[in-house]
Each structure stands twice: as structure tokens, then as C-alpha cells.
Amino acid sequence: LGAFYNDLSAYHSRLTIVVLSEFGRRLGRNQSNGTDHGHGNVMMVLGGNVNGRRIYGTWPGLHPDQLDKRQDLQITTDYRQVLSEILVRRLGNPKLGVVFPGLAAYNPLGIVRGPDLPPDLSANTTTLADTGYQVFVPVIQQCR
């Protein structure tokens, strides 16, 4: 990731990289000494317009009483909160209701710099393409 970021150094002011997983891991081992999918996770954001060198969110703790159902890390920040801020401030796309149906509010954390457009939380548009805004979601296919 560092090499990729360095290779694109000429574009840092236009570059925002988000690294996340679609699932976390449970803290305890299962019957086969592995770990099952959990829901607490981490997300990293890199780029020239990122207010970096900080941790956003709160640490819930690892004591069994602090875990969700005594086995999962608590979720303290909704991933949509982070990604909606990037959509608005970095991609200039305020159509949050189309990208994230059911999102109740736009509450930026201050992770990235950029203009704050008034968010549109309605999902009135048939498809994202109908909005006239862009969302870049890379898809990497598995090579066989």
C-alpha cells in the first residue's frame, strides 16, 4: 500500500484510498481453532486531503462485558458515516440516499477535507447513474 501510494505521489491532492474488509473476526476461537466472521472491524483512509495521523472513533475494549454478545467487538462507527463523507467531500456526490438507502443522517467525522455539499438522503432516483454523479467502486475479479 505504501509503494502504491508513493508511486502516485504526483496525484496526492486528487487521491483518496479507502481500505476495509466486508467483515471482521470474532475474538474467540471456534471448534477448529479458527475465528468466525464478526462485525467489529477497522478502516484506513489515505490521501493528500485526509486529516491523517489520527484514530477516529472510540475503542470499546476487550473485556467480555464490553463485547457484543460477549464475543464480537462493538461497532462504534458506521462505515457509511466514513464513506458518505468521502462521497460528498472528495467526489462531490451528495446523493447519499441513493448510494446508502436508509441512511438517516450525514454526520461527517472530519476525516477528509473538501467542500460540504448539502446531502440528499432521499432515494428518489431509480439508479445511481440517473443522478448525474459518479461513484467509483473498483471490482477486482478473482483470477483462476
PLM regions with names:
Residues G2-L121:
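Feature marks hydrolase-like catalytic cores characterized by long aromatic- and Gly/Pro-rich stretches
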Residues P119-Y133:
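Long, low-complexity repeat tracts used as extracellular stalks/passenger repeats
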Residues P138:
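Conserved functional hotspot residues at active sites or interaction interfaces
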